[in-house]
Design a protein with these regions (language model features):
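Basic, Lys/Arg-enriched alpha-helical interface segments
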Residues: 1-58, 65-73, 81-84
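Residues forming the ATP-binding cleft of Hanks-type serine/threonine protein kinase domains
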Residues: 76
Length: 84
């Protein structure tokens, strides 16, 4: 079972989400604790090789894995997620 941690940036982004979306994100983060047996995870490529993303509705969660630690560094709406 993996441990999920959020960076300061991800915590700020999470706090700005609507409450209903926060609950959905919490459920996804709880699912990530079952790494690597998590469905819906996509490995990113290019300059983000080694990173992963999982979606919940129109929102995306980006993270990387270090052993048994999953570090979430970005949470946001898909329209903003892939911008620089």
């Amino acid at each position: 079972m993996a441990k999920v941690e959020l960076t300061a940036q991800a915590l700020e982004q999470f706090a700005r989400l609507p409450r209903t979306i926060q609950e959905r994100v919490r459920k996804v983060l709880h699912r990530l604790e079952q790494w690597p047996n998590v469905s819906g995870v996509k490995a990113l490529s290019g300059s983000l090789a080694g990173w992963y993303r999982i979606r919940t509705g129109h929102y995306r969660i980006r993270f990387y894995v270090q052993g048994d630690l999953i570090v979430v560094d970005q949470i946001g709406h898909r329209r903003d997620f892939y911008e620089g």
